[in-house]
Amino acid sequence: MESNSNSNETMYGNPNINMGFVDSGNSNIGNNTGSMSPPPQQQQQPQQASSTPAGSVGIGGLSFSLGANGISLEPSSISHRVNAITSKIKEFKQERMETTRDWRSFVGSRQQYGLPNIKDTTSRIKENVVYFQSNYLILFLCFSVFFIITNPFYLLLLGVLLFISVYLHNSTTLTDIQRKIAYGIQAFLSIYFLLYAGSSIFWLVGATCCITLLHASFHSPNSTDETNIKFGDGV
């Protein structure tokens, strides 16, 4: 009995034995934690994140790349495209203005209006349409601007369609599937625009055609001889 009590006292009373037990446990825990490796999913996440190119944004399966191969949003690129668009508008305006007749001649006086003969109606309409074609086009554009201003939703749809067209034309990073999706969205918005704004478009085209036919029918035709036509007179 005395030997057993002495052995117990030496085991529980000796601090070196307890320290050795604790140290061995801590060393085992440290070795286990050091040898542990993260799950495979956690290791693959940085690789997936790094596979996305920098400077690109994905929306609905379409990647809007801002790099050199996509649409660049740098000030120099934007200014270049704006200058190209404005130059085309100026060229179109210059060409139309050169063929635009004097608006006083277009409106005319009472003496320039009269009922045409039935056999001369077709020739009169043809001559006036050829002579005043730029004036009729300007009237159509004025009606179109009024139509768009009074319907902001149509302006939004046209802006989205224009953005998709420009992006598809300039982007070189889209895959075939992404291009098909973009073309599908463009076709859907175009059909929706025609269905939603069908009555307004019919009114726009109908009003322009009625004014053109009435004016060309009752206005006395001017000479369409190239030697007597002076483009841009009075503009």
Curated annotation (Swiss-Prot):
Q: Where are the transmembrane segments?
A: 144-164, 187-207
List, alphabetically, the InterPro entries matched.
Prenylated_rab_accept_PRA1
Q: Where is this region: Disordered?
A: 1-55
Name this polypeptide is given: PRA1 family protein 1
Purpose of the protein: May act as a general Rab protein regulator.
Can you tell me which family this protein belongs to? Belongs to the PRA1 family.
Q: Which UniProt keywords apply?
A: Membrane, Transmembrane, Transmembrane helix
Localization recorded for this chain is: Membrane
Which spans does this entry mark as compositional bias, Polar residues? Answer: 1-17
> Gene that codes for this?
prafA
Q: Which organism is it from?
A: Dictyostelium discoideum (Social amoeba)
Q: What membrane topology was assigned to this protein in its record?
A: Multi-pass membrane protein
User: Where along the chain is composition biased (Low complexity)?
Assistant: 24-48
Check the record and name the PANTHER family matching this protein: PRENYLATED RAB ACCEPTOR 1-RELATED, PRENYLATED RAB ACCEPTOR PROTEIN 1
GO cellular component labels: Golgi apparatus; membrane
